[in-house]
Amino acid sequence: MEFGLSWVFLVAILKGVQCEVQLVESGGGVVRPGGSLRLSCAASGFTFDDYGMSWVRQAPGKGLEWVSGINWNGGSTGYADSVKGRFTISRDNAKNSLYLQMNSLRAEDTALYHCAR
C-alpha cells in the first residue's frame, strides 16, 4: 500500500512540473509586403538546451503548418519550402530563447506564429 501511494505522489509531482512549461512569443506586427519582422520565444519550466525547437503557424481558416526547426545547439536547421531563403531560425541557450527572422514577407505569410518544443 505504501508503494502505491508513493507512485501516485510521484505522478502528481511530474504532472505539476509539466504544467509549468511556458513558451511566450513576442515580436509580431503589421508590415507591408517585402518587410521584415523578428519573432522571439521565451521558454521556461524545462531545460531549454535539451530540446530541439520549432516554429509553426496557422493562417486564417487553415491548419497548422510547420515553418522551421532547429536542433538543441543550433547546429542543424530546417525550413518549409515556402519560407526557405527568407526566414532564419536561431536560438540563444543562455537566454532560453528562440528566434525567427522573417524577411521579404508576403501576404501568404499572414498567420499566427507559435514556437513549439
Curated annotation (Swiss-Prot):
Q: Which InterPro entries match?
A: Ig-like_dom, Ig-like_dom_sf, Ig-like_fold, Ig_V-set, IgHV
Q: Where is this region: Complementarity-determining-1?
A: 45-52
The UniProt keywords, alphabetically, are: Adaptive immunity, Cell membrane, Disulfide bond, Immunity, Immunoglobulin, Immunoglobulin domain, Membrane, Secreted, Signal
User: Quick one: where's region Framework-2?
Assistant: 53-69
The cellular location(s) given in this protein's UniProt record come to:
Secreted; Cell membrane
Predominant subcellular localization, coarse grouping: secreted
GO cellular component, as recorded:
extracellular region; immunoglobulin complex; plasma membrane
Superkingdom, according to UniProt?
Eukaryota
Q: What effect on the protein does mutating residue 41 to F have, as reported in its record?
A: In IMGT allele IGHV3-20*02
Show the segment(s) annotated as Complementarity-determining-3: 116-117
Q: Which residues form a coiled coil?
A: none
Q: Where is this region: Complementarity-determining-2?
A: 70-77
**What cystine linkages occur within this chain?**
41-115
Question: Which PROSITE patterns has this protein been placed in?
Answer: IG_LIKE
- For this chain's UniProt record, which GO biological process terms are given? immunoglobulin mediated immune response
Signal peptide start and end residues: 1-19
Q: Where is this region: Framework-3?
A: 78-115
For molecular function, the Gene Ontology terms on record are: antigen binding
**Ranges for region Framework-1:** 20-44
* Domain Ig-like: residue ranges: 20-117
The entry describes its oligomerization and partners as: Immunoglobulins are composed of two identical heavy chains and two identical light chains; disulfide-linked.
| PANTHER family noted in UniProt | IMMUNOGLOBULIN HEAVY CHAIN
| Known role | V region of the variable domain of immunoglobulin heavy chains that participates in the antigen recognition. Immunoglobulins, also known as antibodies, are membrane-bound or secreted glycoproteins produced by B lymphocytes. In the recognition phase of humoral immunity, the membrane-bound immunoglobulins serve as receptors which, upon binding of a specific antigen, trigger the clonal expansion and differentiation of B lymphocytes into immunoglobulins-secreting plasma cells.
Name the UniProt record assigns to this protein: Immunoglobulin heavy variable 3-20
Task: Tell me the organism.
Answer: Homo sapiens (Human)
